[in-house]
């Protein structure tokens, strides 16, 4: 991976994390809970937990997060999020990289939420 690709990925993570907070998709407490589920139980569990929450617009959230995750694996238009998350679990390297990307995005979002006073 070239330095330019890494820099653009970092810039994208920063932008998406800000948008998650500024567009009201997640508040700081929701971000902290998602980070906890992601860290302790993994990517698929985070997706299932977000879907189970009535106070989280999971479709808006995962459309934003997909902008980062597509660097590892694209999601086709007809593919459901459930199938996408199950398919990435078949490749451990991709799964761990996506987990790192999601953690970084949510950590940045948490800092944005703190700075905006959410």
For each of these PLM feature ranges, what is it?
Residues 1-118:
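Small/polar/charged residue-enriched interaction surfaces, especially the RNA/DNA-contacting tracks
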């Amino acid at each position: 991976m070239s330095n330019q690709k890494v820099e653009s990925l970092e810039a994208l993570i920063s932008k998406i994390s800000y948008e998650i907070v500024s567009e009201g998709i997640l508040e700081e407490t929701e971000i902290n809970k998602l980070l906890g589920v992601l860290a302790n139980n993994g990517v698929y569990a985070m997706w299932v937990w977000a879907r189970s929450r009535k106070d989280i617009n999971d479709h808006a959230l995962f459309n934003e997060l997909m902008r980062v995750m597509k660097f590892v694996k694209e999601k086709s238009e007809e593919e459901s999020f459930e199938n996408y998350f199950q398919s990435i679990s078949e490749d451990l390297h991709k799964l761990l990289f996506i987990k790192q990307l999601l953690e970084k995005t949510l950590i940045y979002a948490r800092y944005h939420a703190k700075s905006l006073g959410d």
